Every structure is written in structure tokens, then in C-alpha cells.
Amino acid sequence: MMPRALAAGGMGAVAVCVVLIGALHVLPPSSEVDPVRRTISQYALLEHATVFNVAVLVLAAGSVATMLALIATGLMPARSGAAVALALWALGLAAVVHFPKHNWAVGPSAHGTAHRVAGVVAFLSLPVAALLVARAWRRHPRWGGHAAATVTLGLLSLVCFAPIVVGVAIEPFTGVRWWRAIPLGAVERALALAEVATVVCLAWWSARAAAVERSPARG
């Protein structure tokens, strides 16, 4: 498949994901979920769980398409830390669906722990991938602007993740469980928006690179 089509697929997948998750926020009964306190994964426990699962898997597939587009255009080596991090992001998303959210009030569970670990891996892997991809191009005359935008979104994602780290760090001192110490739903939604924007940024960058490759030489 041509890199431009792969990049378009990546951006299209993000659009589908945003529409589906957005619908869960406004259509009953999932609209009753508190977006400030409850995580996005809460939708997987409701009757419209399939919508949530499809949205996340579509995003994972679009992320893989974006990764392939980055490789095909030469923006990212296939054998690189950035490629590994992007693959971990996509695998983490798939694992979030495979291991559904657990109600920790009834006690621990293996699949609940797997869900939580998969979420952390995914949320951290994408900004790392973005920073690694951009690092090689930050001084490039053509792609420096794209690299700067990618770095900005990668750093924004890490900033959005920071409240979770703070909540975990202060738990031993406050005695308040970390997910109650912060508005976890709002934090996760801000993080999710930053990360889907990062995927779009990477896909758009690879689409522009593919367009340059296809343009006739000027002499």
C-alpha cells in the first residue's frame, strides 16, 4: 500500500475513533458516566461496550498504518526505538480491549492489572515514539516545523500524564488512593486528546513526505 494511503488511513482511523468515543459521551446510557471522575474505559462495562472496543481497535489499526507510512517515507527507520515505541502503543491499545476494565472495589484481578499495565504502556509509548521520530528532523529545513509540532504534542501528552504520577507519589503520605486524589476521568480524557492529536500529526507528516516523493523533480 502506498504511504500516502497509509497516512490517510491513520488520520481516518483517528476521526472514526473520536466520533465513536464522542458519541458515547452524549448518547444514553453511557452519557451518564461522569467524565471528570470516571475513565474512558468505563464505557467498556456498559451495554455499548462494543462501540468502545471498536473505537480503540480502529485507533490501534490506524496507528499501525501511520507507523508503516513513517517507515515507507523514510521518516522513521523500521529498526528503531521509535518504531518499537509505536508498536507498543498499538499493542497496548489492543490489550486494553482484550483485558477489560476491572471494578477494583471488589478486589484485585489479573485481567484488571493487565488492563492497567496496558494503558500505562500505551499512554507512555506514544509520546516517546513522537519525541524519537522528531529528534532526527528537528533541524531539517523542510521537516523542522513538523518535528517541532510533533515534539510539542509528545511533551503535552507527558504533561497530561503527570497528574497520575503525582497521585501515585503522594498516596503513601495522604492515604488517599491515587485515582481518587485526582480527577482521573478528566486527566485521562485530556491525555487521550493529546495522544490522538499526536497520531494525526505523525500521519499528516508522513502524508506530506509521501506527497514530496511523488512530486516531479524541478530543475
Summary of predicted features, one role per range:
Residues 15-33:
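Alpha-helical transmembrane segments of multi-pass membrane proteins
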Residues 27-32, 99-116, 168-189:
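Interfacial helix-loop-helix junctions of multi-pass membrane proteins
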Residues 33-48, 180:
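Perimembrane loop-to-helix junctions flanking transmembrane segments
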Residues 42-61:
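Interfacial helix-start motif at the membrane-water boundary
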Residues 93-143:
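Membrane-proximal helix-loop-helix units in multi-pass membrane proteins
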Residues 135-219:
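Terminal transmembrane helical module of multi-pass membrane proteins
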